[in-house]
């Protein structure tokens, strides 16, 4: 399937499985009359495969060592990308960033690294399922930077177009999205 056909098919899956209208309160606290819940798409076999493929293609030229997903929404995505990268003989390891460190055990904010493994000096991409203001991803970036990593890109599946682009620019972070909310609202 061509990239444009994959993108169109994934948009159809998102529209069917993950997009809805109706009043909802977002993680940012804002009210909205539409929402995206990408978990049903990320956990659908075809949706997961297409998300992984398009995301992998979007970051392939970034010379990435690791891809980190925000808890909980982007964890399935990070895993799918890691698996696909292995199949393409260009392995990119995955980790996830907790909203807050666990209060027991190792008390880590960044999870998924093997004992003795470190992000220090590594090039990382942070992935998010849906981005509104960018606040959650910026907090995740801070946690990953504390591990010594270089953040080369923040990549979201859907940008709600409510200030994230400006927030990432102000933070000096490159930001891209696979889709814009307007692509779903205007259909």
Swiss-Prot record:
The keyword ATP-binding does not apply. Pathway: Pyrimidine metabolism; UMP biosynthesis via de novo pathway; UMP from orotate: step 1/2. Its cofactor is Mg(2+). GO terms for molecular function: magnesium ion binding; orotate phosphoribosyltransferase activity. It is an enzyme of class 2 (transferase). Keywords: Glycosyltransferase, Magnesium, Pyrimidine biosynthesis, Transferase. Orotate binds at residues 132, 160. 5-phospho-alpha-D-ribose 1-diphosphate binds at residues 98-99, 102, 104, 128-136. InterPro entries: OPRT, Or_phspho_trans_dom, PRibTrfase_dom, PRTase-like. It catalyses: orotidine 5'-phosphate + diphosphate = orotate + 5-phospho-alpha-D-ribose 1-diphosphate. One of its GO terms (biological process) is pyrimidine nucleobase biosynthetic process. SUPFAM superfamilies: PRTase-like. Its EC number is 2.4.2.10. Gene3D superfamilies: 3.40.50.2020. Homodimer. Belongs to the purine/pyrimidine phosphoribosyltransferase family. PyrE subfamily. Catalyzes the transfer of a ribosyl phosphate group from 5-phosphoribose 1-diphosphate to orotate, leading to the formation of orotidine monophosphate (OMP). This is Orotate phosphoribosyltransferase. It comes from Rhodopseudomonas palustris (strain HaA2). The lineage of its organism: Bacteria, Pseudomonadati, Pseudomonadota, Alphaproteobacteria, Hyphomicrobiales.
């Amino acid at each position: 399937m061509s990239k444009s056909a994959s993108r169109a098919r994934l948009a159809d899956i998102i529209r069917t499985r993950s997009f809805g209208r109706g009043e909802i309160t977002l993680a940012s606290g804002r009210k909205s009359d539409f929402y995206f819940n990408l978990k049903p798409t990320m956990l659908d076999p075809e949706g997961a495969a297409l998300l992984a493929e398009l995301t992998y293609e979007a970051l392939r030229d970034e010379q990435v060592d690791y891809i980190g997903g925000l808890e909980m929404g982007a964890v399935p995505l990070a895993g799918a990308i890691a698996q696909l990268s292995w199949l393409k003989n260009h392995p990119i390891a995955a980790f996830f960033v907790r909203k807050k460190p666990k209060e027991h055990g190792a008390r880590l904010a960044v999870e998924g690294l093997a004992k003795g493994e470190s992000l220090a000096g590594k090039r990382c991409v942070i992935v998010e399922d849906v981005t509104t203001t960018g606040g959650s991803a910026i907090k995740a970036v801070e946690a990953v930077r504390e591990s010594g990593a270089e953040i080369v890109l923040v990549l979201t599946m859907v940008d709600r177009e409510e200030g994230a682009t400006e927030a990432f620019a102000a933070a000096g972070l490159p930001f891209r999205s696979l889709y814009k909310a307007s692509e779903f609202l205007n259909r």
